[in-house]
Regions:
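Single conserved hydrophobic/aromatic residue that forms the stacking wall/gate
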Residues: 218-228
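Short loop/turn microsegments at loop-to-beta-strand junctions
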Residues: 1-2
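Glycine- and aromatic-enriched mobile tails/lids
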Residues: 5-27, 31-220
C-alpha cells in the first residue's frame, strides 16, 4: 500500500543504503508504508499503522530525543520557499478557478485510473491529468484575506492533490501487472519476478521519476536489499 517508506520503528527511510533513515523524521498511520500490508489493505488493518506503529514511534522518539535539546534552526531558504508558495497562490489572479480544475482532475482519475485499467486508458490518463496542473498557471483565487479563507485552503489542498494524482497515474501506468487493488485487464496476472516491490515516485511539478524498492517479506528487522 502507498505511503511514506518507514522502518518498523516509524523512521522514514532513504534510498541511500539498507534501512538508512532520515534523522528526526517519522511517519505513522495511513501516511506511512511500513511494508506490513499486501497490495490491498484488509478492513480495520489501519489499526496496525495507528496503534502498533504509533506506539513504536513514541518509544523510538523517547530514545532519540534528549531532554533540553534544542531544535535545529530551519534554513531561511526553506521558510522563504513555503511563504512564496502561500503568497503566490493567495495572490493568483488568472481565469481558472480551483473548483473547475479539481473537477477535471476527479473526472480524469475516475475514467482513466479506475478499478479496471488498461495500457490505453492509463496512457490517456498520463496525458490528461497534467492539464489541470497546467491550468494552475492561470489560476484565480478571489478571496485574498488571511482569515477563514476557504478559497485559499481549497487551492492549497488542490496543489497537493494534483501532484498526488499525477504520481498515482504514472505509477499505475508503469506497473504492468495486476496486484491487489491494481487490476490491469491487459496484464491480469501478478509478476513477482519484476514487481514484488513498492513503487517509489518523485514528483517535480508535472514530471515524475519512478523507481522501486523491495518489499519486506520476512519478520523485521530483516533489512531490505543492502545493494539498494
Amino acid at each position: 500500500m502507498g505511503g511514506i517508506p518507514t522502518n518498523y520503528k516509524a523512521e522514514v527511510l532513504t534510498l541511500n543504503g539498507s534501512e538508512k533513515t532520515v534523522p528526526g523524521l517519522m511517519a505513522i498511520g495511513e501516511a506511512a508504508c511500513v511494508s506490513v500490508h499486501g497490495a490491498n489493505r484488509l478492513g480495520s488493518n489501519s489499526l496496525i499503522d495507528l496503534v502498533v506503529f504509533g506506539r513504536a514511534a513514541a518509544k523510538r522518539a523517547a530514545e532519540l530525543v534528549k531532554p533540553g535539546t534544542p531544535h535545529e534552526e530551519i534554513p531561511q531558504s526553506e521558510t522563504d520557499k513555503c511563504l512564496e508558495r502561500f503568497d503566490r497562490l493567495r495572490n493568483a489572479s488568472g481565469t481558472n478557478n480551483t473548483a473547475d480544475l479539481r473537477l477535471a482532475m476527479q473526472k480524469t482519475m475516475q475514467s482513466k485510473c479506475a478499478v479496471f485499467r488498461t495500457e490505453k486508458t492509463l496512457k490517456e490518463g498520463v496525458n490528461e491529468i497534467r492539464k489541470p496542473f497546467e491550468g494552475m498557471d492561470d489560476l484565480s483565487v478571489k478571496d485574498k484575506s488571511l482569515i477563514f479563507n476557504t478559497d485559499l485552503v481549497e487551492t492549497l489542498e488542490f496543489d497537493n492533490l494534483i501532484r498526488q494524482a499525477i504520481t498515482t497515474m504514472d505509477s499505475a501506468y508503469h506497473r504492468k501487472e495486476s496486484r491487489g487493488a491494481h487490476a490491469r485487464e491487459d496484464f491480469p496476472k501478478r509478476n513477482d519476478e519484476k514487481f514484488m516491490q513498492h513503487t517509489l515516485s518523485w514528483c517535480d511539478g508535472k514530471k515524475t521519476k519512478i523507481d522501486y524498492i523491495p518489499c519486506l517479506l520476512y519478520t523485521s528487522p530483516s533489512p531490505r536489499d543492502p545493494n539498494r
